[in-house]
Regions:
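Metal-dependent phosphoester-hydrolase catalytic domains
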Residues: 155-163, 167-173, 206-207, 233-274, ...
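Active-site His/acidic residue clusters
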Residues: 214-235
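N-terminal, active-site-proximal structural segment of metallo-dependent hydrolase catalytic domains
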Residues: 16-148, 176-194, 210-214, 227-229, ...
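Feature for exported/extracytoplasmic and membrane-associated proteins, marking the mature portion
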Residues: 145, 150-153, 158-166, 170-215, ...
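Hydrophobic h-region of N-terminal signal peptides that target proteins for export
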Residues: 8-17
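Active-site metal-binding loops of divalent metal-dependent hydrolases
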Residues: 35, 76-77, 154, 221, ...
Length: 390
C-alpha cells in the first residue's frame, strides 16, 4: 500500500467500499490518461521518445511514477508500427526517477493500428476533395496520429483479445445515421455503408493477473464537435460509447463482429473495466443527449465511485467563464478546456463491471501547493485511476 501514498496526497480519493475481513490477495490500480501526444508530424513522438529529454514526456513519467498504475491506457499517443514506443518510454523516461520519484517499468504492453489518419478514399467531409485529414476513417494527418497504447505490469493474453477497428457503423442496429436539417442523409448510401464506427479503435484486452482474469475495454471516441447541424461527430461519439454497452450486455451483442471475424460480446460474468477518454460529460458540454449515460446507467456497470480532485474544483472556481454555467460538480472534471467556450469537463472514465471489489478512485489534479501541481500542464486532460481487489 505504501506505493500509493504519494499519489493519494495529490488527489482526493473516493472510498467506495470497505474492505472485508477476507481480503483478496491482490489489489491493482487501473488508469486512463489522454496525454495529448498526438503530434503534428509523423515521427515527432518517436524522436521525443528517443531523445530522453522531452519536457512533456518527463512530466508524463513523473505523473506515472506518482500515481503508479498497474494497467494504463494512454490516449492520443501516436502509433507507429516500426517504433518501440513502450520500450523507449520505459528506458528513457520511466526508468529514470523524475524529481526524486522512484523509477518504474511496464513489462507488458499492447498496441495496434487505429483508424485515425488512415485514408478512406472517400470525400467524407464533402469539400469536393479526397485525401484530407477529415477524409480519414478517423480525423488525422497521418496513419496512427492520436493512437492508443496500453502499458501493464501483467501479461495480455493476445490470443484471447479482440479488436474492432473495422466494424461498420451501419452494422449497428438503430445506428444514429447523421441527417441534414431537411431530413436527407448527410452521408450518401455508398459512403454510409463503408464508414467504420471507431474513430480510433475498440480493444477488448484479456489480462492474466496472477491467474485471475480481467478484461480492459479500451477506446477513445471522436469529440462530439467540429461538425454542423447534421451532428455527425456527436452521433458517432454516441454510438462508439453505445458499442461497449451492447458488447457488455448479454442480450445486445449478437450483431458485433470483431476484426478476426468472431461474433458476439464479452462472456456473461466476465469481469471488465471500460477505460478511455469518452469525450462525453454526463451533464455539460456538447455531446449527444444521454451519450455517456448509456454506460453510467447500465445495471451491470458500477459507476458509483466518482473520481474527484481538489485541483478540478479549484480550476473551475478560478477560471470561471463557461464553468459558471455548468451543472456538474467541478471536482469531478478531468479536462481543462477553454474557459470562454466549453469550460472544464468530465470526459475520462474507468468504469468497472458490477461485482468487482472497488477500493477507491481519483483524478490526478493536485491543487496549487499540493505535490505534482506543476506536472498537470503536460496535457489538457488528467489521469483518472480506479483501485480494485481481485
Amino acid at each position: 500500500m505504501h506505493r500509493y501514498l504519494l499519489a493519494l496526497l495529490c488527489c482526493i480519493p473516493v472510498s467506495c467500499q470497505s474492505a472485508n475481513d477476507e481480503e483478496p490477495p491482490l489489489q491493482i490500480r487501473i488508469a486512463t490518461f489522454n496525454v495529448a501526444m498526438g503530434l503534428e508530424t509523423q515521427g515527432a513522438l518517436a524522436a521525443a521518445l528517443e531523445s530522453g529529454s522531452d519536457a512533456r514526456l518527463k512530466q508524463l513519467a513523473a505523473i506515472l511514477q506518482t500515481a503508479r498504475p498497474d494497467i494504463l491506457l494512454l490516449n492520443e499517443f501516436d502509433y507507429d508500427p516500426v517504433v518501440d514506443a513502450a520500450g523507449l518510454l520505459n528506458r528513457n523516461y520511466l526508468a529514470k526517477g523524475q524529481g526524486g520519484r522512484q523509477p518504474m517499468r511496464y513489462r507488458h504492453h499492447f498496441r495496434a493500428p487505429v483508424n485515425t489518419g488512415v485514408d478512406s478514399g472517400l470525400d467524407l467531409d464533402r469539400d469536393g476533395q479526397k485525401g484530407g485529414p477529415n477524409d480519414a476513417w478517423g480525423f488525422g494527418r497521418f496513419p496512427g496520429q492520436y493512437g492508443m497504447l496500453v502499458l501493464s505490469k501483467f501479461p495480455v493474453r493476445t490470443d484471447e483479445s479482440r479488436t474492432f477497428r473495422n466494424f461498420l457503423w451501419s452494422a449497428m442496429p438503430g445506428a444514429l445515421r447523421p441527417s441534414n436539417p431537411d431530413g436527407s442523409s448527410y452521408y450518401p448510401d455508398e459512403t454510409w455503408l463503408q464508414l467504420r464506427l471507431s474513430s480510433k479503435s475498440h480493444w477488448d484486452l484479456d489480462f492474466n493477473i496472477e491467474g485471475r482474469e480481467l478484461h480492459l475495454l479500451a477506446f477513445h471516441p471522436t469529440p462530439p464537435v467540429f461538425d454542423g447541424p447534421d451532428d455527425h461527430n456527436g452521433r458517432r461519439n454516441h454510438d462508439e460509447i453505445r458499442f461497449w454497452r451492447d458488447y457488455t450486455d448479454p442480450s445486445g451483442a449478437d450483431y458485433i463482429v470483431d476484426d478476426q471475424g468472431a461474433a458476439g460480446g464479452i462472456g456473461p460474468g466476465t469481469p471488465f473495466v471500460i477505460a478511455g477518454d469518452f469525450n462525453a460529460d454526463p451533464l455539460d458540454g456538447d455531446s449527444y443527449p444521454g451519450a455517456v449515460a448509456q454506460l453510467l446507467d447500465a445495471p451491470w456497470i458500477d459507476s458509483s465511485c466518482v473520481p474527484r480532485s481538489a485541483g478540478g474544483a479549484e480550476a473551475a472556481r478560478e477560471q470561471a467563464g463557461a464553468n459558471r454555467r455548468h451543472r456538474g460538480d467541478p471536482a469531478t472534471d478531468t479536462g481543462d478546456f477553454s474557459d470562454q467556450q466549453v469550460g472544464n469537463l468530465r470526459l475520462d472514465y474507468v468504469l468497472p463491471s458490477k461485482g468487482l471489489h472497488v477500493i477507491g478512485c481519483g483524478v490526478f489534479w493536485p491543487a496549487a501547493g499540493e505535490p505534482g501541481h506543476d506536472l498537470v500542464s503536460m496535457s489538457d486532460h488528467r489521469l483518472v485511476w480506479l483501485d480494485v481487489q481481485l
